[in-house]
């Protein structure tokens, strides 16, 4: 087993600067080997800041590095699939920011390429690694809340992006729902062992101009087991404070984040059984990335089991149905 996993970071945008680079630069068992971005001065400045020796503007040059074990793909959404495929062709393990591809067929191509290369590809679903989510997961999987009948979730933010790839549907793949809603949908599916959806209804607030991404989306998904998932997201919300919520309703209790609050029926009464403990100083965002990246390093070092992200095929098929429903203004049956 190698003492340290040598990792290259592809893409030097906000998520790399806020999460991947600062976390990996201090992580035991990991070494930042190189950074690649088409903005060479930015890449060089970040390399100097985080003690990275090599910088590149071409992914193929980075992939030729000796003893490169893995890469983090943090490029614009439409580049995820080609960049992941290039890394796998070079026999390098991959952690890719979400979405893994712009559609389900793209994920299937990536899974097939990973199998051919005998390499691992993981998706950066950092929300699954949040401390409060892990606590909720223990209540759900332990059966303490009973059968889940509904999940209500939402994310309201004010993001005044005026230019760039995130505003163009062809490059971003979507707007408010893809960016804010899909992590909530993935979390709902993950907590319910990817229940089978049977119908989708969605309504969106369209962006301005042809080919623009949506500013908001209201989604309802009904599953074969009776579960209903409702999601409301907006990236143009003007209010006193931004809001993020995730609520589970079950036959013997309920739970809500954030912070995590859990109520169970005990002796015929609703009783607060929320886990206690001091809140950490670290934000949920950084804590989740630290846990996710530690897991990635452990998987590459073969200290933790590898699970191919086949569930992302099912996720993106639902996402495709959501957008179809919103575009055609009708319910879609699956």
Each language-model region and where it sits:
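C-terminal helix-rich "cap/oligomerization" subdomain common to oxidoreductases
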Residues: 1-4, 70-72, 224, 295-334
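N-terminal Rossmann-like dinucleotide-binding module
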Residues: 1-50
């Amino acid at each position: 087993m190698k003492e340290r996993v040598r990792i290259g970071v592809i893409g030097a945008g906000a998520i790399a600067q806020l999460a991947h680079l600062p976390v990996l630069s201090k992580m035991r068992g990991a070494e930042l080997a190189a950074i690649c971005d088409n903005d060479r001065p930015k890449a060089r400045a970040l390399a100097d800041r985080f003690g990275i020796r090599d910088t590149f503007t071409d992914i193929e040059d980075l992939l030729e590095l000796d003893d490169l074990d893995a890469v983090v793909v943090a490029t614009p959404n439409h580049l995820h699939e080609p960049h992941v495929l290039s890394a796998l062709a070079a026999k390098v393990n991959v952690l890719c920011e979400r979405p893994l591809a712009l559609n389900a067929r793209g994920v299937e191509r990536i899974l097939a390429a990973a199998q051919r290369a005998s390499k691992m590809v993981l998706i950066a679903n950092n929300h699954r690694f949040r401390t409060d989510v892990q606590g909720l997961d223990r209540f759900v999987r332990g059966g303490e809340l009973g059968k889940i009948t509904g999940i209500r979730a939402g994310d309201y933010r004010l993001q005044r992006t005026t230019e760039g790839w995130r505003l163009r549907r062809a490059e971003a793949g979507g707007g408010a729902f893809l960016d804010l809603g899909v992590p909530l949908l993935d979390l709902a599916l993950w907590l319910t062992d990817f229940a089978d959806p049977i119908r989708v209804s969605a309504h969106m607030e369209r962006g301005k101009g042809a080919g623009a991404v949506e500013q908001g989306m209201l989604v309802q998904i009904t599953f074969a087991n009776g579960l209903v998932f409702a999601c409301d997201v907006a990236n143009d919300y003007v209010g006193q404070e931004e809001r993020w919520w995730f609520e589970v309703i079950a036959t013997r209790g309920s739970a809500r984040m954030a912070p995590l609050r859990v109520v169970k029926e005990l002796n015929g009464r609703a009783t607060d059984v929320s886990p206690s403990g001091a809140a950490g100083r670290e934000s949920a965002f950084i804590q989740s990335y630290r846990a996710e990246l530690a897991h990635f390093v452990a998987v590459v070092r073969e200290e933790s089991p590898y699970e191919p992200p086949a569930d992302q095929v099912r996720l993106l098929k639902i996402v495709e149905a959501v957008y179809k429903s919103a575009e055609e203004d009708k319910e879609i049956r699956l």
